[in-house]
From Swiss-Prot:
Belongs to the TACO1 family. InterPro entries: Integrase-like_N (IPR017856), TACO1_YebC-like_2nd/3rd_dom (IPR048300), TACO1_YebC_N (IPR049083), Transcrip_reg_TACO1-like (IPR002876), Transcrip_reg_TACO1-like_dom3 (IPR026564), YebC-like (IPR029072). GO terms for molecular function: DNA binding. One of its GO terms (biological process) is regulation of DNA-templated transcription. This is Probable transcriptional regulatory protein RHECIAT_CH0003714. HAMAP family: Transcrip_reg_TACO1. It comes from the Bacteria. Its main location: cytoplasm. One of its GO terms (cellular component) is cytosol. It comes from Rhizobium etli (strain CIAT 652). Keywords: Cytoplasm, DNA-binding, Transcription, Transcription regulation. It is found in: Cytoplasm.
């Protein structure tokens, strides 16, 4: 297990999930609004909006919140958000990619740069670390849909590239360009996915010790606390021993 998936598991074990739920809803709502503005406000005619709503439902976001976010896109006074990607380095030379939706690029860039600097990292130029990641589609299912063999069979039939299963669920990877087609094909055998999204997956992971892992966790935590930041990806890896200590 590596990178951001380890961070999520640590936060889950520490019980931090509930504390960030309201912030998560606002981030999901922002993605829904941007998706609705980018195309039609009808999820059956707008693939990005359909996936945004699906991901929001998977996080138990109330229907009223989802409807409000869609309606906000039609408002004349609605904010216009830009999609921005930041790339930089964390402690131990680890690579970090930050995706944001912002109505003020200067504010967000300043905040992200400050967070990197305070954590002993450095914000780089666009492209400075993304070459060491693959931009792929990731479709997740709960363990209850079936065992690893069943999911693997369905994934191969749907045209996916890989499947990983752990105690949290099934993670199906496919080409970014095929995300919509693969997720649709999977629904016939496995039902609706829990989440369907594009992610940055590290080609190689950088092992870090406990001290650097703690610094990285603080850095990622601070980035995710920023209202404009939607997703954070990294290529760090810690041993099971360090993971157990950090999760305590």
């Amino acid at each position: 297990m590596a990178g951001h998936s380890q961070f999520k598991n640590i936060m889950h074990r520490k019980g931090r999930q509930d504390a960030v739920r309201s912030k998560m809803f606002s981030k999901l709502a922002r993605e829904i609004t941007v998706a609705a503005k980018a195309g039609l406000p009808d999820p059956t005619m707008n693939a990005r909006l359909r996936l945004a709503i699906q991901n929001a439902k998977a996080q138990s976001m109330p229907k009223d919140n989802i409807d409000r976010a869609i309606k906000k896109a039609a408002g004349a006074d609605g904010e216009n958000y830009d999609e921005v990607r930041y790339e930089g380095y964390g402690p131990g030379g680890t690579a970090i990619i930050v995706e944001a939706l912002t109505d003020n690029r200067n504010r967000t860039a300043s905040n992200v740069r400050s967070i990197f600097t305070k954590a002993g990292g450095a914000l780089g130029e666009t492209g400075s670390v993304s070459f060491s990641f693959d931009h792929v589609g990731e479709i997740t299912y709960k363990l209850s849909v079936g065992d690893a063999d069943k999911v693997m069979e369905a994934a191969i039939e749907a045209g996916a590239d890989d499947v990983e299963t752990d105690e949290e669920g099934h993670y199906i990877t496919c080409a970014f360009e095929a995300l919509g087609d693969v997720s649709k094909a999977l629904e016939s055998g496995l039902g609706e996915a829990e989440t369907v999204k594009a992610v940055w997956r590290a080609q190689n992971n950088v092992p870090v010790d406990e001290e650097k892992a703690q610094s990285l966790m603080k850095l990622i935590d601070s980035l995710e606390d920023d209202d404009d930041v939607q997703n954070v990806y990294s290529n760090f890896e810690v041993s099971e021993e360090v993971l157990a200590k950090l999760s305590a």
